[in-house]
Amino acid sequence: METVGLNAWYGKKQALFDVSLPFAENRVTAIIGPSGCGKSTLIRCLNRMHELVPEAKVQGKVMLDGTDIYGSALDPADIRARVGMVFQKPNPFPNKSIRDNVVAGLRYAGVRDKRKLDEAAERSLMQVHLWDEVKEDLKHSGAGLSGGQQQRLCIARALAVQPEVILMDEPCSALDPTATAKIEQLVIDLKKDYTVIIVTHNLQQAARVADTTAFMYLGKLIELGDTIDIFEHPREGLTERYITGKFG
Amino acid sequence: MNFRRRLVDRALIGLSIATVITAIVPLLSIVYDVAAKGISAINVDFFTQATPLANTPGGGMGNAIQGTLILVALSALIGLPIGLLSGVYTSEYGSNWYGSTIRFLGDVLAGIPSIVTGILVYALIVIPLHGFSVIAGSIALGTMMIPIVSNTSSQALKAVPNSIREASTALGSRRWRTTLEVIVNAKGAIATACLLAIARITGETAPLILTSGISTNWFTGVNQPVGSLTYFIYYFAKSPFVNWQNLAWGAALILMVIVLGINVAVRIVTRGKRAYS
């Protein structure tokens, strides 16, 4: 996946300026930067969620497997099934059971076979290491789980539709350190099968989980490189000042 | 200083309690009066017999009860679907000028006096059909229900957190499917909105005087007039005949039980639940 000359606006205010950013397949890429740098806007352009905001505009290309996802022949809903998203605050469907939460995306796609759905639920819950914790309670509501469990449930839900890319918008910022550690380990496990793009304002987290890191500031991509390089010898002065905490 | 503040505190609490009592007393007094005067008219005949002639013993309000039930059912058939669809539109799809206009018109429609709706339906339906009818009454009451249901269901849907819409959309669901998800999450509040709208129109009188008319017979067809509890209360209560007045009190009691019953049921069912569940 990569963006080519991506620009985005909220009404008259431009939030992204000509961002061209490649995301390596089966790797974890972290997007870091201070508040307002455009990282959430960028990630929402990757699954066509940005355009749902009233008066939002997108210009430029986002390539997925060689095709621009903003091509006029494409259905945004199909794109969103191929590019999954996990949000900052865990948002399981409160009126659905755990199992129904996980298979919600499959139901939207028209899958009705109960056995297929149950198998998919088990597979996804095992992928996020939640299966053993909830296998007795699949019929219970998702709202009864802890924050960390709910977030893993949301990740399982995103995985069930078998996307190619997983977007994570600050997935751990609402969680305690133990839950955070579990999710970070999960992110590293997931890159075997998926391309993971994670937005985080926690620099240490980026250092822990990401192979590649992109630093953004005021809507522009400032620097992109291997995480080790970005943290140990950043090329740009601005990157160095952010990493060392001189602003942020 | 401290003493004065405590005094003011106590005085205001006392004033609040006094005003609450002042507000509740008329309600309790009405309930008591209607119950006391109406209970003597309630017996099996009240529900099974049709309205009697003046000063004639026996009879009941069976046809009026039947008429009210039929009118409310048909009105709900007209008003609930249109009101709900309108509420869904203004909440989920109406972020443009078109949606704002619909919302505004809905507010205006909600404020139209019921007798005006009655006159309108009289001119549009009763005159061409050459007479009062159940259809006319249902259209009038249904039209009154539309803005009530639309506004309250729209509020119920808006109260559903955006996180649910985002979660659904991010999984690749189509717009209508996401909307359905939101509706399901608000189903309690929407059901409440529908029930309260039904309770409201059950007690309407003015539009029925001009549309469904009154009849001493049981239901004979949707293009015929039909008796209703509210119209009969009006008609019997202002008559000089005692048997009719007693039946009117009984009808008032039944009507009150129905409306209070719906309101209480709604309260019990939604007690302790989150606003949007």
Segments predicted by a language model, with ranges:
Chain B
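Interhelical loop and adjacent transmembrane-helix boundary motif
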Residues: A54-N55, L208-M256
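C-terminal transmembrane helix and the adjacent membrane-cytosol boundary/short C-terminal tail
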Residues: L12-G14, S154-K158, L180, T192-L195, ...
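Transmembrane alpha-helix signature in integral membrane proteins
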Residues: G59-Y89
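Short membrane-interfacial helix/loop motifs at transmembrane-helix boundaries
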Residues: V25-G58, G213-N223
